[in-house]
């Protein structure tokens, strides 16, 4: 089992305590490995939220000894300009404003801005100018939050 999968198993119960969502986990092996955890609080992810998660998961990681040498642990929000990396993010960020870019045009458009309604039947649904737009998931080249 990969480090990210083991960390996820340990992390999910911690996040559930405060209704936080796991956005992504990155493990970068090197002389001094880096473990990056991206979390989302629907009420706004604060530094205190990141610190709380860092202390809790850090203590568990030390007990479980998943990483066999000194490592850097980073816990943060996904950031303003981060592109969606996994399908779960379409549920995590439901209700938020997004920009969706397509590979092929839909009604002569390749960029859609609106409120994310979610992913249903392999289609990304957004509310754009009071109209629901359905974009086949395989046609999506990029999705990110719109600030």
UniProtKB/Swiss-Prot annotation:
GO terms for biological process: ribosomal small subunit assembly; translation. SUPFAM superfamilies: YhbC-like, C-terminal domain, YhbC-like, N-terminal domain. It is found in: Cytoplasm. The keyword Cytoplasm applies. Pfam families: DUF150_C, RimP_N. CDD domains: YlxS_C. One of its GO terms (cellular component) is cytosol. Gene3D superfamilies: Ribosome maturation factor RimP, C-terminal domain, RimP-like superfamily, N-terminal. The keyword Zinc-finger does not apply. Keywords: Cytoplasm, Ribosome biogenesis. Belongs to the RimP family. PANTHER family: RIBOSOME MATURATION FACTOR RIMP (PTHR33867:SF1). Required for maturation of 30S ribosomal subunits. This is Ribosome maturation factor RimP.
């Amino acid at each position: 089992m990969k480090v990210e999968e083991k960390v996820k198993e340990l992390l999910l119960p911690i996040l559930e305590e405060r209704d936080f969502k796991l956005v992504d986990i990155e493990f970068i092996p090197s002389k001094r490995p880096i473990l990056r955890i991206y979390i989302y609080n629907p009420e706004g992810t604060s530094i205190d939220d990141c610190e709380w998660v860092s202390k809790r998961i850090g203590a568990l990681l030390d007990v479980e000894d998943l990483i066999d040498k000194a490592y850097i642990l980073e816990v943060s929000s996904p950031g303003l300009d981060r592109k969606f990396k996994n399908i779960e993010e379409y549920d995590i960020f439901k209700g938020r404003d997004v920009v969706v870019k397509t590979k092929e045009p839909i009604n002569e458009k390749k960029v859609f801005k609106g409120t994310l309604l979610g992913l249903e039947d392999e289609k990304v649904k957004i509310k754009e100018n009071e109209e629901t737009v359905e974009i086949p998931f395989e046609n999506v080249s990029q999705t990110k939050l719109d600030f």
